[in-house]
Amino acid sequence: MSATLFDPKSIAVSNPVDTSTQASLAHASQPTGQAKKKVYIATQGCQMNVYDSEKMGNVLGDSHDMVVTDNIEEADVLLMNTCSIREKAQEKVFSELGRWRKLKEEKPDLVIGVGGCVASQEGDNIQKRAPYVDMVFGPQTLHRLPELYDKSTTQRNVKPKDRIGTVDVSFPSIEKFDFLPEPKVEGYRAFVSIMEGCSKYCSFCVVPYTRGEELSRPLDDVLAEIDSLAEQGVREITLLGQNVNGYRGEKDDGSICRFAELLHYVAHVDGIERIRYTTSHPLEFTDDIIEAYAKLPQLVSHLHLPVQSGSNKILAAMKRNHTIDVYINQINKLMAVRPDMHLSSDFIIGFPGETEEDFLDTLNLAKALDFDHSYSFIYSKRPGTPASELPDDVSLATKKERLAIFQKVIRDSTLKKTEEMVGKTLRVMVEEIADRYPDQLLGTADNTRSVLFKATEQQKTDLMGKFVTVKITDFVSPHMVRGELVDILD
């Protein structure tokens, strides 16, 4: 598995509606007339973590009437949703916790919680190293946050080793989805997690150890969540999973729904006009998925398919279980049904044993397939993974040099593709008034580019959430273009 990475950030989530799904968690709300408690959520890592952070806010809102804030100074609860993909992930978490400790010294009643993949790895060691942390929970137990919160607030003065029930990093099947409140969103795009964990066990990856084996949500559960989002005005869905195209959800009759079939079901949900998904694995990118691109216009013309290396030798060492020829053949089949497809991928540069020839294979692959963009990083060991036992025989200086060369190739490709959009007409979903250009609306094209176009005051209201076509006149940046409104499709 490979995750698309974001810079660590805090996200604000709208206050959720009441729902019966948390009825079994009979926690008290704030007393009448008392100000609502506020929770600040710092999110690191992939889209799965962004999704999980939204659910953390929803769970605490539903159980304790909390509201999410993006102002850390006013928060009553601080939650860190951690990611273990990047180098020295654990130390970065403890470094940030050190800064949070100062906030707790100023506000002793402040509750601090650590969740996500680092929490899953470290467990109760987090409270041993940082005893001011009140609760620790894994990706599969975020639905138990209300219970952990209640237990932590009653044990403020208890030493970490004597606390009871404030650490839960277990893997309780996929039950968390059964206890989450109904989704509540603002905007026209939403993430929907369709599965958890990964069973591919790539030699460099910690995900199977932090999120567990692959477990797919039942088909009806996934569709019910998407239906609810569509009723709230969502028009674009991104299906999430560490190995999303390995989805095998159970149907009512006990049969299994595979990923390609799921795409057809989602495409028939009233109101959903766009479907994206991440992160996929080449082993699971089957012909029936490619056929879905030929049949479903809702599937966008953008695919993120991590390859990690252009060298068969390195792919074997990574235990990716496919070759470059297989990968290229898949892309060629896809291009045959979607010639306008934009590709992105993940790459690890400087994996143990990578020679100059191996690196050139990776560079040549990037040039041959003309990737639109990529998430590329130098290799660093992840504790507990098979690759961590390999000799890290590529010097840091060489890794950095190769990464710079590789990323320039990708940047050049991105810029070229953006320049080629000038003169073309793109379908765009309008989302907001542009902050820097108040006379213009901002939307997203199928190929992920941000698109600006001038709009009247009336259009600034009428076109929100609508699909339009825009003829591109110039580019603003490698990932943003500007154009003129051609037609309103809704």
UniProtKB/Swiss-Prot annotation:
This protein's record includes keyword S-adenosyl-L-methionine: yes
Entry GO terms, CC: cytosol
Catalysed transformations (reactions): N(6)-dimethylallyladenosine(37) in tRNA + (sulfur carrier)-SH + AH2 + 2 S-adenosyl-L-methionine = 2-methylsulfanyl-N(6)-dimethylallyladenosine(37) in tRNA + (sulfur carrier)-H + 5'-deoxyadenosine + L-methionine + A + S-adenosyl-L-homocysteine + 2 H(+)
rRNA processing keyword on record: no
Alphabetical keyword list: 4Fe-4S, Cytoplasm, Iron, Iron-sulfur, Metal-binding, S-adenosyl-L-methionine, Transferase, tRNA processing
Annotated ranges, domain MTTase N-terminal: 37-154
Places the protein is found: Cytoplasm
EC code(s) of this entry: 2.8.4.3
Family: Belongs to the methylthiotransferase family. MiaB subfamily.
Function: Catalyzes the methylthiolation of N6-(dimethylallyl)adenosine (i(6)A), leading to the formation of 2-methylthio-N6-(dimethylallyl)adenosine (ms(2)i(6)A) at position 37 in tRNAs that read codons beginning with uridine.
Annotated protein name in UniProt: tRNA-2-methylthio-N(6)-dimethylallyladenosine synthase
Gene: miaB
